[in-house]
C-alpha cells in the first residue's frame, strides 16, 4: 500500500495505527491453486483456492471475484455464440455498449478466449494482442455527396480487407450496387479479392440471400458478407437454420454485456482453517437455500474422461490429502438420485488445479493468449454436445468423493 493509500485509510478514522503500519509492508505470502484459464467449469466447483493467512486472503477477495466473474461471464457467452455460428467467423464488436472502458478492453480479451476471431477494440489489440479489425461507419458514408463516392474513396484508402457498410440508405437498391461498382473499379483491377460488405439492419437473412445473389451475378463470388445488429447465439442459430448467406458475424452489446444472463455468480468462501498444531479444520456455510450451502474443507478437483471417446464424464471433489486411483474401477452416481450409479473402467482422471503462487511467489508459467484460446477450444470439445445445449442441457455432475464406495 502506498503512502497515499495509507493516508486515505487513516482519514476514515476506523483503522488503528497497528493495522495501517501492517499495510505499509503488506505482501501476499500464501499459495494459490487454480484451474488453467480456459477450462470449462461447472456450478459448485472450486475454480481457485487460496491458502494464506486470513487477512491476506480477505484483502485479495474482491479483485479475485471481479476478475474471475467478469472474464468467465464474457468468455462463456462468446463460446456459446461461436458454437452457434458453426464454423463461421465471429468478431467482438461491443466496445461502445460495454459497461465501462475496462469492461470493453478486458471483455474483448475474454471474448477472444471464448472463441471470437478478433475484436473491434484497438486497445485490446495493443494491450493483449487480440487481432483488431473493423469496418466503416455510417457517418463515413453520410459525409460524402454520394454513397458511391464514399465506397470508392474507402477502397482507395483501405484496399486491403475493405468492408463496405451497405445499409445507410437502401441496402439492395443502392448499397450493394454501389459496393459492386466500387469493388470492380478499384480493387478487382489490382487483383485484390479480400473485400466484403456489411449488413447492419433489416431482415439479415433475407438481405444476405439477395445480396449474395447480386454479388455472384456480378462475378464477385470472393466478396464476403458480414452481419451485425443485436446478434446473439439464438439469433445466429436461427440465421444458420434459415441458411442465411453470412460469412462473418459481428456481435456487440449482447456479447460484451452477456445480455441474456449478465451476472456470473462466483463466490469466495472460507472452506477450512489451520489450527496452531497444523491441523486443517473444515468449515461450512449453512443456508436455508440449499444452493448456497458450501462444501466444506480444503479440496482438490478431478475430471474423469472416457478413454474411447475422449469425452468428460464427471467431475469429483475430494479432500486435499485424498488421491483418486485411476487404475481401479471407479463408481460415480447421480447426486439427485444416488441409487443411480455407474462404474467406470476404461477411463482416465486428471487433477484440474495447478499451483499458481507458492509462498507468495508466482511459479506458474503464463501461456500466451492464443495458447489459452486454443486450450479453451480443446477442452470445450471434450464436453458432450448434450451438455452444451443452449436450452435444457444434460446434467454434468460434480460429485463428492467417497473413498469407501468409490474404488470397490
Report each predicted region and the residues it spans.
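Short hydrophobic/aromatic-enriched beta-strand-loop microsegments
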Residues: 133-136, 245-251
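Conserved small/polar residues in nucleotide/adenosyl-binding loops
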Residues: 401-407
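Glycine-rich phosphate-binding active-site loops on the catalytic face of alpha/beta enzymes
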Residues: 247-263
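Buried, small/hydrophobic-residue-enriched core segments of structured protein domains
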Residues: 14, 20-29, 38-220, 231-235, ...
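C-terminal helical cap(s) of enzyme catalytic domains, especially alpha/beta-barrels
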Residues: 259-277, 373
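Extended boundary segments
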Residues: 1-14
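Glycine-rich beta-to-alpha transition loops that act as phosphate-gripper elements at the mouths
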Residues: 226-233, 252-254
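C-terminal terminal segments
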Residues: 305-399
Amino acid at each position: 500500500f502506498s503512502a497515499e493509500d495509507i493516508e486515505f485509510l487513516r482519514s476514515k478514522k476506523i483503522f488503528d495505527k497497528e493495522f495501517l503500519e501492517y499495510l505499509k509492508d503488506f505482501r501476499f505470502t500464501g499459495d494459490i491453486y487454480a484451474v488453467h484459464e480456459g477450462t470449462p467449469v461447472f456450478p459448485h466447483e472450486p475454480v481457485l483456492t487460496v491458502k494464506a493467512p486470513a487477512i491476506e486472503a480477505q484483502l485479495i477477495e474482491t479483485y479475485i471475484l471481479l476478475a474471475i466473474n467478469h472474464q468467465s461471464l464474457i468468455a462463456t457467452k462468446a463460446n456459446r455464440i461461436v458454437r452457434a455460428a458453426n464454423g463461421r467467423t465471429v468478431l467482438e464488436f461491443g466496445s461502445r455498449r460495454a459497461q465501462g472502458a475496462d469492461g470493453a478492453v478486458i471483455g474483448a480479451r475474454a471474448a477472444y478466449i471464448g472463441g471470437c476471431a478478433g475484436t473491434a477494440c484497438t486497445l485490446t489489440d495493443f494491450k493483449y494482442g487480440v487481432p483488431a479489425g473493423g469496418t466503416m461507419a455510417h457517418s463515413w458514408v453520410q459525409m460524402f455527396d454520394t454513397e458511391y463516392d464514399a465506397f470508392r474513396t474507402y477502397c482507395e484508402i483501405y484496399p486491403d480487407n475493405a468492408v463496405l457498410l451497405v445499409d445507410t440508405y437502401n441496402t439492395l437498391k443502392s448499397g450493394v450496387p454501389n459496393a459492386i461498382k466500387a469493388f470492380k473499379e478499384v480493387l478487382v483491377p489490382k487483383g485484390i479479392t479480400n473485400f466484403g460488405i456489411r449488413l447492419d439492419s433489416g431482415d439479415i437473412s433475407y438481405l444476405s440471400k439477395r445480396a449474395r445473389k447480386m454479388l455472384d451475378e456480378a462475378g464477385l463470388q470472393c466478396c464476403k458478407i458480414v452481419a451485425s445488429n443485436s446478434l446473439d447465439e439464438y439469433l445466429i442459430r436461427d440465421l444458420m437454420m434459415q441458411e442465411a448467406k453470412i460469412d462473418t458475424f459481428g456481435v456487440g452489446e449482447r456479447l460484451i454485456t452477456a445480455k441474456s444472463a449478465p451476472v456470473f455468480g462466483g463466490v469466495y468462501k472460507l472452506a477450512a482453517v489451520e489450527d496452531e498444531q497444523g491441523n486443517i479444520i473444515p468449515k461450512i456455510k449453512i443456508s436455508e437455500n440449499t444452493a448456497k450451502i458450501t462444501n466444506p474443507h480444503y479440496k482438490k478437483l478431478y475430471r474423469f474422461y472416457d478413454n474411447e471417446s475422449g469425452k468428460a464424464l464427471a467431475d469429483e471433489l475430494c479432500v486435499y490429502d485424498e488421491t483418486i486411483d485411476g487404475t481401479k474401477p471407479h463408481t460415480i452416481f447421480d447426486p439427485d438420485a444416488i441409487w443411480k450409479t455407474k462404474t467406470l473402467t476404461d477411463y482416465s482422471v486428471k487433477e484440474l488445479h495447478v499451483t499458481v503462487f507458492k509462498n507468495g511467489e508466482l511459479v506458474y508459467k503464463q501461456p500466451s493468449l492464443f495458447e489459452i484460446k486454443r486450450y479453451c477450444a480443446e477442452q470445450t470439445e471434450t464436453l458432450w454436445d448434450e451438455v452444451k445445449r443452449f436450452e435444457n442441457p444434460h446434467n454434468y455432475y460434480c460429485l463428492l468423493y467417497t473413498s469407501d464406495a468409490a474404488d470397490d
